Regions:
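Accessible peptide chain termini
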Residues: 1-3, 36
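Low-acidity, Ser/Thr- and Arg-rich intrinsically disordered low-complexity segments
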Residues: 3-6, 10-13, 17-21, 26-30
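Beta-strand-centric surfaces of beta-sandwich/beta-rich domains
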Residues: 35-411
Length: 411
């Protein structure tokens, strides 16, 4: 366990840098110390950095300061008078419209993103968190480095929010979505919200906190996140979380939204990571699905009456924050809100980034177990892969914007 939150943040920032030179030069540039058996950089962002001077320039973008201008925030008047919360949010975003949340120039780094929005616009529009698509573009690129439904990006798949208490992603009651992944850019950044919901979004609140920099070191990598979904996985075929990545980088996290389509225990499948030319067999694998997400023995807990249940949890680097048999934003006077069992998990490789030099592929087996032993399963899986890499990156194979509403819709 890390001895302070600053050490956790320091480790997170270390994942942004790749190491391509000799050990001697690495020692000079990182000036690392050993803390609790882990290598930490002294000069990363954290509590220890607060005592040092810097040439970075603090900025933020939100509805009150859409350009992030110095001395240009909170200028709009309200019924209370000038500069009194005149533009707290974006209003009435039509279905099908794209909104540029941030269009930044020069070099810098996004340090924090906060967002909130309703999870349902009406009884006929319940899946807002799957139908708003968040995309990020770095350094003038034409294909996004981040393309993920809003809820899934913040570990809230199934179009329903849950409480998440981790280092890079935190979600607090009533859909307060927070992201602390460092997002550096060498020459500009553009963040776009795409409304593919079937109805207008009445109000969307957001803030993007960042710093302007004179320049960034050449070895700083950019942040990527990719969403995939199979409504029914193929029997005996591993589900692909990530592939088609070429270049040098670090794999830093997985989010999984799982809907069980069969009974019995679902979580015997192994996460497998193929690195740098691996073909038939991976270099890295887990011993089971719940093991990968930090649990064990089927997350088993007991109710007061002695019945088994799966115990949820949310920690700094791994969690099982969501488990439900009902989704409360889809009730109707004509049917109940019962669903197949839905679960959400995350695993952050921050103390232990999976480093690749040329390519990476990440997969998940769908294997269950019953009274007769292991068996191949078919379930509904959606996932987000998070990684840093050198640009340019390959276009994502499953484009979220090209999926239909049914392909995004939770069970």
């Amino acid at each position: 366990m890390l001895s302070s939150n600053s050490e956790a943040v320091s480790t997170l920032n270390m994942a942004v840098r790749y190491k391509s030179r000799g050990e001697e030069q690495r020692a000079r540039t990182r000036k690392a110390t050993i803390i609790m058996g882990m290598t930490m950089p002294n000069n990363a962002n954290g509590l220890e950095a607060l005592t040092r001077t810097t040439t970075d320039r603090t900025r933020c973008v939100n509805a009150e300061n859409p350009q992030g201008g110095k001395g240009r925030a909170a200028m709009t008047a309200s019924q209370l008078g000038p500069s009194r919360k005149g533009t707290p949010c974006l209003k009435n975003i039509p279905s099908g419209q794209d909104v540029i949340l941030a269009d930044l120039s020069g070099a810098g780094e996004i340090r924090h993103i906060w967002m909130t929005v309703t999870d349902a616009t009406s009884p006929t529009g319940p899946n807002v968190l799957r139908n708003l698509i968040l995309e990020c573009y770095w350094d003038g690129e034409q294909t996004p480095s981040v393309s993920v439904p809003l809820g899934d990006f913040f570990c809230c798949g199934h179009a329903q929010a849950c409480r998440v208490e981790s280092v890079p992603v935190a979600v607090y009651p009533r859909r307060g979505f927070n992201c602390f992944w460092p997002m550096p850019f060498h020459n500009g950044a553009r963040i776009v919200l795409r409304n593919r919901h079937n109805e207008p979004i009445e109000a969307f609140f957001y803030q993007i906190d960042y710093v302007e920099k004179d320049e960034l070191p050449e070895d700083v990598m950019t942040f990527h996140a990719q969403w995939r979904r199979q409504r029914v996985t193929e029997l005996g075929q591993d589900y692909v979380i990530l592939d088609g990545v070429h270049g040098r980088g670090s794999y830093v996290g997985t989010y999984l939204a799982l809907t069980a389509l069969e009974s019995r225990w679902w979580g015997e499948g192994e996460i497998k990571v193929y690195l740098d030319g691996d073909k038939d067999y991976p270099t890295w694998c887990s011993t089971g699905s719940e093991d990968y997400f930090g649990g064990a023995w089927s997350f088993a807990g007991q109710d007061p009456d002695g019945r088994m249940h799966e115990a949820t949890y949310s920690g700094a680097y791994m969690g099982f924050p969501f488990h439900s048999r009902q989704l409360d934003n889809r009730e109707s006077q004509y049917w109940d809100a019962d669903t197949p069992v839905t679960r959400g998990f995350y695993r952050w490789h921050i103390p232990d980034p999976i480093i690749f030099a040329s390519d990476i592929k990440v997969t998940l087996q769908q294997i269950g177990v019953d009274e007769q032993g292991y068996f191949e399963r078919q379930d509904d899986l959606a996932s987000v892969a998070y990684w840093y890499q050198q640009e340019p990156h390959q276009p994502f194979p499953q484009k979220v914007l090209e999926t239909g509403e049914r392909d995004r819709r939770p069970r």
